[in-house]
Amino acid sequence: MTISHNNPPPLHDQLCYAIYTAGIAIQRAYKPLLDELGLTYPQYLVLNVLWSGDEQTVGAIANALALESSTLTPLLKRLETAGLLRRTRNLSNERQVVIALTEEGRALQHRAGCLSDTLLAASMQTPKELADLNHDVRHLRDAIYSQIGGWDAPA
């Protein structure tokens, strides 16, 4: 693909568009199951962060999801209202809010586990193909952030 600074390639030839629309397709594939769980996709992502390590600060969750804390706060409030997590002040640093799963939030992890099966079936890819793609996209993301700054990818 030849890149011209005067005429961008057609939208369907742009990698950013392919990644963007693939993300939308994945969210649409997940939507029926997320609806059953009573979750939005961003709420599901927040819970995933907590399922991998409970009791995290708002800042740590925001960093893991590449979001601003101010964007995350309304999501956390809705998840707390739904009984899936608790927000408490950090006793050693009152400026920090610590997020912890409730029993109901932990129990939801098992029910949400089938989302990866949904992607596998909808994509018509093998598990290895999806793992390789995941690796490549993460590598691209990390390379871009290493150049532009602004996000420390979680390990």
Residue ranges and their predicted role:
Residues 1-37, 131, 144, 155:
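N-terminal leader segment of winged-helix/HTH proteins
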Residues 4, 8, 12-15, 19, ...:
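Alpha-helix initiation/capping motif
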Residues 17-20, 24-71:
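N-terminal helix-turn-helix DNA-binding core of bacterial DNA-binding proteins
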Residues 22, 26-29, 65, 108-127, ...:
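Alpha-helical linker/hinge and terminal dimerization helices associated
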Residues 34, 47-50, 65-67, 72-79, ...:
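Generic leucine side-chain signal with a strong bias for well-ordered alpha-helical environments
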Residues 77-138:
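Charged, amphipathic alpha-helical coiled-coil/dimerization segments
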